[in-house]
Amino acid sequence: MLKDTFTLWNLNNPWRLGAVVAYYAVLSLPGFLIVVINSVGAFWGREIVQGEITQQISEAIGPDAAKSVVEIIENSRNSDKNLFATIIGIIVLVFGATGVFYQLQISMNEIWSVKVDPKAGIWKVIKDRALSLAFVMVIAFLLIVSFIASTALTVLSGFLSRLWEPALVYLAQIFEFGLSTAVLGLLFVLIFRFMPDMKIQWSSVWLGGFMTSIMFNLGKILLSFYFGAANPNSAYGAAGSVVLILLWVSYSCLILFFGAAFTRIYTEKYEVEIHPQDFAMKVEIEEVVVEKGCDNPPEEEEKK
């Protein structure tokens, strides 16, 4: 099954899909961060949330990228606007925050070989944007849960360290890794369930979602080591932080798309037959070779 998963994953050119999502992730970053920080900050405190996000980014891709993200947040907040400009700004902010999920949905549809019916019209676009906004809010909710749990675990680790029980401290760290895997797994389950325009059952997405979560957490650790040792942003000067964000999102998408391919293979092998949504259609892409080079024997046509 892993062989079939890799074949499907590679067939859909995940590097291209990851690059597209990474590009839109950078464009969506200001709106996404402001929406999440304001949403979670209403319960937890904006400065605390911003500090936690900055710390996570610093651990994942380095302090330079984290500093750039802080500047993006501050610049988005400090712009002086009148009432009309503020309303337009909010609309643009929400539209920008949902852009990366909209592109992610398009990529998921490619992996599932499904396409939106052109007759679906504007209501399909509105529905997709609403779904993307819902995912932003889901992430905000999961961040609240994660912050509460992380705070509790930090207090617990400090208490255990004072007892001079290193094994218990390591146990708390393992539990924190498991908690992170569970939270991310739930997010990936929701992505695999609702993002593709397919009628997918809940039973089809649990294994793929949590497998992707484990790979994502392990990949995050490996990427942090790579970024720390190789320092790939040094060759790009002032644009280095943006390049790091692009690389991190692109590499993360490779894992996400592998999980999506696994979910499709698993569903087609073990679950009931699934069908596209009412506004979508299943597609098959066929390559037709109409001409070969001179070194190849002449053939009229070859289909793959």
Q: Language-model segments: what does each one mean?
A:
Residues 1-304:
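Membrane-embedded alpha-helices and immediately adjacent juxtamembrane helical segments
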